[in-house]
Amino acid sequence: MQSLSLLPLISLVYTSPLQLDIATQRRTKLSLETDEEGTKSALQQRLVCYERTGQYGESYAYTDYAPFLNQFDNRIQSCCFDGIWILYGDVQYNGGNTMAHNFWAYGENYCTDMPSSFINQASSLRYTGHPSDMYRDSINMYFNEYFMGEEEFAYNDAPQLNYDNRAQSIIVTGRQWWTIYQYPNYQGYSACLAPGNNGFPGF
């Protein structure tokens, strides 16, 4: 178990996984065999989005945060997900417009059309969790509801957060549970947060 301070969010400890829109298919070039301990092999975060449904038309691949989609702004109709990705209806992850829509999904070569209300709506996007391994333990705290706006994340225990009392939504990745605390140095009220099943994220 790991720890962190939170509750109004100040320290943290982690502890294991919840889920959302998941699909597990085999990638063509990366083995997803489980290791000797039964855990999934590392899976690089990567998102390929298309200008038409059914993964047709012009496409663009993302492996990092994209606060602006530039020439692909308001053009995404479908995507293939490797990892855990959030797409936002406004630039900079809806940080300046928390009324804008967003959409998140995850999986291993999981391809899907955007919901009808989100077709041609995405203006920014980012992954959550570790960039080189969607199955690695992490806690990702967002300063608005529904994983919008600025964030703070941790892969290990943290007796004090950089941004006190800011988290309004959280995603947990990996298999470890996390304990969040009201005050620094693991003091005050606490709560445990679990990831999803089988190494998938908890929202």
Which functions belong to the PLM regions below?
Residues Q2-L4, P8-F203:
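Compact beta-sheet-dominated domain cores in extracellular/mature segments
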